[in-house]
Amino acid sequence: MNWPIHGSNPQYIYNHLQLPMPKNIIDFSVNVNPFGPPALLKEKWIRWFAAVSDYPDPNNSELIEVISEKEKLPRSSILPGNGGAELIGLLAKMFSGKRVLLIQPTFSEYERMCTANGCQISNLILKENDWEIPVDDLSSKLARADVLFLCHPNNPTGIIYSEQLLLQIVNACQQQDCFLVIDEAFYDFTDESNTIASYLKDYNMLIIIRSMTKMYAIPGLRLGYILAAPSIIKELHQNQAHWSVNALALLAGKECLLADNYINKTKTFVSIERKRMVHALQQAGYLVSASRVNFYLVRDPELGDQLPLFMFLVKKGIVARHTANYQGLNGRWLRFSIKQTHENDILLKELLAWKKKS
């Protein structure tokens, strides 16, 4: 049996496998905040409804002002967009025909969008279990690259790297006249600071992507932003469609960025639940990635390909994210998000049952 094509809706998986869809499904493949959107969004939603009758601000002025204050960066260094996917697409267009280096395993959208824009793709595939970046190997590859994409924290492993290593990488890129794009879609789930956004003023070839859909659980609204040198922001903005960010997303985005208590509550919960799950799974004999965010990789070392475990869970109404299409993982791991405690308990129960069964 082949791996099913992963979709954003579990229905695609059950259809592909020709299995009846259980009445109750827990989708662990989606990495959004288990608490759902901040409560203030629901409270203000009706008041915001009038905004759908007007065109949104094409300059995103108020949202940019909030981001500027939060990041302590000039407004000219900020570009909001219709989610991380649109922003990756804008970057791929700017880098059209260039040589792009990807550190694998990583988010597949970089390769998809860059390939669509005629880029030449090369890969640095990290070794399993620790997924450390070999700086010497990376430096030699940078000599033949115009752009490096780094997903940090990494998706799908959840691994983070030290500020010292990140600065080594950005310095190596700068010396090779190579752009460094860091996708920080999950940076705000970690316990510690893991961003080098404050160094943007020192590195004119550093570009940072931020997604707001993950932490704030608003993937249906689509919102994110890029932090970069003003010259880069200007070029990207020229290629961006007018009214790229809708009016409701602009209003919600401002509220989300001010929801500090919500972020702190999420970080604490995710950290506690992740540590609990990882400990229990390791005790049961599973291998687990050293994630620091709201998802983690799991592997039954008694299996090569994890398809049997994936199928076992699917039949129980539990959907994992398989890794068959991640270079360097090739189906040997499954990814699970952190959800509410009772849902995590259901997953743990079934994973323990699998080990007893096998």
For every predicted segment, state its role.
Residues M1-D54:
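N-terminal "arm"/small-domain region of PLP-dependent enzymes with the aminotransferase-like
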Residues H6, K93-L150:
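PLP-dependent aminotransferase-like
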Residues P37-P38, N59, M205-Q282, Y286-S289:
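PLP-dependent aminotransferase class I/II
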Residues A39, L303-F310, H342-I346:
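Short, conserved charged micro-motifs
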Residues P56, S68-L90:
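Short loop-beta-helix segment that forms the pyridoxal 5′-phosphate
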Residues N129-D188, L297:
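Active-site phosphate-binding strand-loop segment of PLP-dependent enzymes
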Residues A284-K316:
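Conserved PLP-binding catalytic core of the aspartate aminotransferase-like
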Residues K315-I318, N325-S358:
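PLP-dependent enzyme catalytic core of the Aspartate aminotransferase-like
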